[in-house]
Amino acid sequence: MSLFSAVEMAPRDPILGLNEAFNADTRTTKVNLGVGVYCNEEGRIPLLRAVIEAETIRVAQHASRGYLPIDGIAAYDQAVQKLLFGNDSPLISAGRVITTQAVGGTGALKIGADFLKQLLPNAVVAISDPSWENHRALFETAGFPVQNYTYYDDASHGLNFAGMLADLQKLQPGSVVLLHACCHNPTGADLSQAQWDQVIAAVQAGGLVAFLDMAYQGFDKGIAQDGQAVRIIAEAGIDSFIVANSYSKSFSLYGERVGALSVVGPDATSTKAV
């Protein structure tokens, strides 16, 4: 028997399948709500002026193409930290944040999931109901059992915050809680600052591990306000948490996979070991 003869065809990706169906549709009034990309009136993905300018500068520099360090481009990692935590963040100045470049937000989540599995082999991961479908797959592939916490209320078309808080309070210490920092995918229902305060209190009281996913910073209320969840957690005194974020959509560089994973530790020594 051939090595690969027993391989079964995997199910088609539902989102990419929709894109294929869209391309095959001959109607002129069709609208593509499948793949999450921004297109102009001609159906093309525009290249942002800032991206064009940055690309022009980089090409003119004729930069070398040597191997990067394992955490990627240092200047990029530093820029990510400042955007996430603020230019004057005490976490950064204390050396408590380590950031690594990642292959998009998905790559950042994958790195974070595999890393946590080494530290917390018996932990449970809790994701919102509903959540981005790949969240479950990424953590299950890493070996975690994944369960849902209450989030969206279909009847009111809004957040069921009481249910969410109750479910978080039931989790065992050491459980990992995946939280959408802003622009919740797929519902768009976000926590208010007061609600974030209560969620963080539940995380602290329950000894839970906060893992934030932020793929859409700036798409709701602006860069600063959309990033408030990260800073609220930092200011609350939680000594260790993780942030996976992506700029693939922010820069309309979907195929470039612009992501990062940031880990906050209790002190510089612990963070350096990470």
In which residue ranges do the predicted regions lie?
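N-terminal "arm"/small-domain region of PLP-dependent enzymes with the aminotransferase-like
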Residues: 2-75, 79-82, 86
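Short catalytic/ligand-binding loop motif for oxyanion handling, primarily in non-cytosolic enzymes
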Residues: 39-43, 186-187, 219, 252-253
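Conserved core of the PLP fold type I
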Residues: 57-207, 217-219, 227-234
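Conserved core segment of the aminotransferase class I/II
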Residues: 79, 235-274
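Walker B catalytic acidic pair
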Residues: 214
